[in-house]
Amino acid sequence: MKAFVLFLREVESTHQPAIDAMISAKAYGLDAEMFEGYTPSRADEYIKRENLKPYFPGPKLYKIKWNKGGVRGCMISHLEMWKKCVELDETVVILEHDSVVVSDTWKTPFDQLLHLDKHRFVDPDPDLDKESNVEKLEHYRKGQQQLQGTYGYVVKPETAKRLIRGAYEEGLTAADMFVKDLYCNIQVVTPRAVKVNNQESLTSNRDFYI
């Protein structure tokens, strides 16, 4: 299975971690390659060019998130990876530069979209050494089931199509809030296949804009 590892060409600190993520993915059987993402300024150009709009359903959290340049860059980067998934017509694994693949449970059969880390920031994995299992992801914000981070998930082409359609019809928000039960059945695998190496993110930096 192909895997995309998101990095930013303009941000050197993402380069080596992304290479390490790619190496870890290959070690567990993935056909991994680097995928150049969008900085805030290029994301803003993309949003304008594609006539996209933000999704503001009411809660202030959505506007607070969308005002961060890193959030917009991350969302457009994932949108482009979904488009690549559809173009290839293949199920793909999507990783970010600070991801580390730690097992091959990404191979476990699932319905539409599979999150690869049930216990974010918890190490060691509480499910380590157990039989692989897929279950509904129980993570909710603002009354919606959403992804808990976008650093590691598997997406099928039909699901990617629905996510793309939602981006153009409903609007954009932070990528992990955008991926929700409105568009797909979100499941999670245990033990984890991916962990995140860094609790700090460019999406949380209000001053990140290049």
Please tell me what each predicted stretch does.
Residues 1-95, 99-210:
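An acidic/histidine-cluster motif and surrounding catalytic segment
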